[in-house]
Structures are given as C-alpha cells and as structure tokens.
A protein has these predicted regions:
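Membrane-interface helix/loop caps of multi-pass membrane proteins
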Residues: 1-228
C-alpha cells in the first residue's frame, strides 16, 4: 500500500504540481467499499441464523466500526486478541488491517503534500524518520503492550512507510534494479525472508517488532528487483 499510494501521489505532484484529494479518495472508495459491502451483506444472514444474541450484537458492532474504518480500535478495546480461538466468531476481525490502511490513507496524503510543497528536500528524511520512529515504537510496544501494539497505526505505519521510501527513491532516482543477474537472485532472497517468517514465527515471536523487519524487507526486495 505504501509503495502504490506514494507512487500515485508523487507522480501526480511532479507531473501536475497539484494533487486532487477528491479523485484520490474516489478511487479508494471504488476499490474498497464494493467488496467490503458484499462481504457484509453475504455474511449477515449466516450471522443472524447461527450466532447467539451476544455474539450477533458484537458482529453488528464490528460491521459499523468496519464501515467507519475504525474496527482496529473496536477489537482492541473489546479485548480481542488476534489469532485467539474466540476470533473464530468474529468474521470481521480481519478488517483491523483495512482500518489501519484507511487511517494511513487519510493522514499520509496530507502530510506528503505539505512536505512536498514546503520542505521538498527533506521529504526522504521525513519518510525515513517516520519509519524509524514507528519501528522503534513497535519494538517497544511488542514487549510492553502487545495487543495495542498489534492494532494501531503508529506501530504499524513503518510497514507501510517502507514501501513509501521505495517509491520515493524509484521516482526521484529512476533506479529499478536493471542488472539481470541481481533481478534473478534478489527476489529469491526476498521470498526466502518471507517464507522463513511464515515457518518460524510463532505465538512467542514479538510482532510487530524488529523481528517483523525480516518479512517486510523481503517484500521490499521483491518489489525493487521485480521487472514489472
């Protein structure tokens, strides 16, 4: 998301000198809302038939918070631990990440536009600083408040900003990993980092934290050295 959104915004700013928030959010709504509404409508009859009253009330609340892109806060304050068995009765638990993403979409374009217009030469430093601070918060939070750490944008933002940094470098420097040998080798290394995390991360692994840097780096390597 960070790579794609930053690429879209920066290309528009560089090409036109301006940025249309209206068109940006229209595109996001058209991409996200139809699928979200379909899932909600498809799951509602089954929830009505099979969930007990208490679980159905929770289900209905999760729908409302999901529509408001704040379900991450709802699930945190309701004490829901992601991956716990109780999550099986919360079909919209996965929308926490969509909420984090949409919160990023609301805040990031404004910050990027202001920085680009008035502090352009510091833009990359701003992105890197945001990445480092967010990663530091995530690593601290993983040990001190793991549930809050899991659900909120300040400790998840670095994962998105990693893509933003890649997009900035590509757009401003024009580098895309043109060496064919490196293009063959490094995507495999990136895939290894991701698969290693899938196989060896477990319930005892602090996440998100410095450990999470491994799969995020893997994704970044694949993006950077891919031909398309």
């Amino acid at each position: 998301s960070g790579y794609l959104i930053t690429s879209i915004i920066l290309k528009e700013l560089i090409t036109t000198g301006s940025f249309s928030f209206k068109h940006f959010y229209e595109r996001r709504i058209r991409r996200i809302l139809p699928a979200l509404l379909f899932v909600m409508l498809a799951s509602f009859p089954f929830a009505w038939m099979y969930l007990f009253s208490g679980s159905f009330i929770d289900f209905s609340k999760s729908i409302l918070y999901s529509l408001g892109f704040s379900s991450n806060f709802y699930f945190y304050f309701s004490g829901q631990q992601y991956g716990a068995e109780s999550g099986l009765l919360k079909p919209f638990l996965h929308t926490w990440s969509l909420s984090v993403e949409e919160q990023f979409y609301i805040l990031f374009p404004v910050l990027l536009l202001v920085t680009f217009k008035y502090f352009r030469k510091y833009l990359i430093y701003t992105l890197v600083l945001g990445f480092v601070v967010s990663l530091g918060l995530a690593d601290w939070g993983s040990r001190n408040n793991p549930s809050f750490n899991f659900y909120v944008l300040p400790t998840r933002g670095w994962e998105i900003l990693a893509g933003s940094i890649l997009a900035y470098i590509e757009i401003t420097q024009g580098h895309r990993g043109k060496n064919k040998t490196l293009n063959l080798i490094f995507p495999s290394i990136g895939l290894f980092l991701i698969v290693h995390s899938i196989l060896f991360f477990n319930d005892e692994t602090f996440h998100p934290s410095l450990y999470t840097f491994s799969p995020v780096l893997g994704v970044c390597v694949i993006i950077w050295f891919s031909n398309k």
